[in-house]
Amino acid sequence: MKSKRRILFPLLTLIALLLCLSPAFAGGETAKTGLGHAQASAVKWQADAVLVQIITVSGNMDGTAEKWSFLFHSPQAKKSYKVDVKNSKIDQTLEVSPSFTDAVDGDFMDSIQAMAEAKKKGLKGKSRAMMTLHVMLQGTKSQGAYWNIVSDQAEGRSTLINAKTGKFFRHQALK
């Protein structure tokens, strides 16, 4: 009887652990995971295309998302191009009017590190977060790329993380 318990208890513990962990890894990728696919598509669209924004409106609280949207701008064509990447594949592309034109330097921290820093500085959420990476100037000490994170429990504020240094910048009221 004792030998059955010795086998059964670790087995049940393993099953419980797997059930608890599986939602955290279900369908989530980091922002940088799909960036290569998006960039290749953007360069086919316009050779001078530069990354200007990354966004997910349905991110997970671990900094991953099922789908990321990448916005590129062509200074020569004066147009923008949106590339949606889902499950490491291009899901949809669309030429759009330019809204952002400042290029995001390729040397930025990934979404999971940005989310971890935001949580360290008080961001709370149940399961969902909107994450945006773009260049900001107004209201910052210096122009640069920032992660702007709003969770499903954001209480009227977003959390800004400097995407180059990985440091918390501030909480900002949503207007």
Regions found by a protein language model. Give the residues of each.
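Long, terminal "pre-/pro-" and other extracytoplasmic accessory regions
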Residues: 2-6, 20-175
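Bacterial N-terminal signal peptides
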Residues: 10-20
